[in-house]
Amino acid sequence: CNNPYARVRTPAIDQLARNGIRFTDAHSAGALSGPSRYGLVTGRYFFRTPKKSEYWGYLSPYIEPERLTIGSLMRNAGYTTACVGKWHLGLDWQLKDDSKPQILTPKKFGYTNTDFSAPVKRGPTELGFDYSFILPASLDMPPYAFVRNDRVVDPDVILTADAYPKKQDETVYAWDRKHTNENDIYWERGVWWRNGEMSRSFKFEEC
């Protein structure tokens, strides 16, 4: 029902559209994915939060613990809720040594003081979602690890540079030639991400 000329059949999506509400006019709450996601999850404009930047993998939580979310709203209405995919709204990571900061080097791209074996707090399951399977940030910044509910799936952490050597000779540069930072990891043709912590079993490869 969404596209009569489509070559691929989508009966499940079509049924959802017929039995629910189709949103055909959408507007973004921000120019980046994080602010847009914050607006979708909370129903609030991102500029109403005290945070204005700090967009990287280990950012602190954006959503206040008492904030109503689409997850808690739907759960209160009797639905079972889940959050799957990119989160990048901040998590409360536990530290190995509370006397030290989380980031141990000024470049942010080496090992950190993060305890990946400890429960991860202030995530989706504390914000109205019964189940979650998320990537904490985005695919171009550490930590590269999956989090199921409040636990890192594979807490055995290494650096991306240990798994994928730095290779610039086969790299296809972007239009602005931004893929030249010394902390970047290059692998095969055009694949690029920042050096940092990753689960040993995490695979950053095309299937």
What are these regions (language model features)?
Residues 1-207:
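Formylglycine-dependent sulfatase
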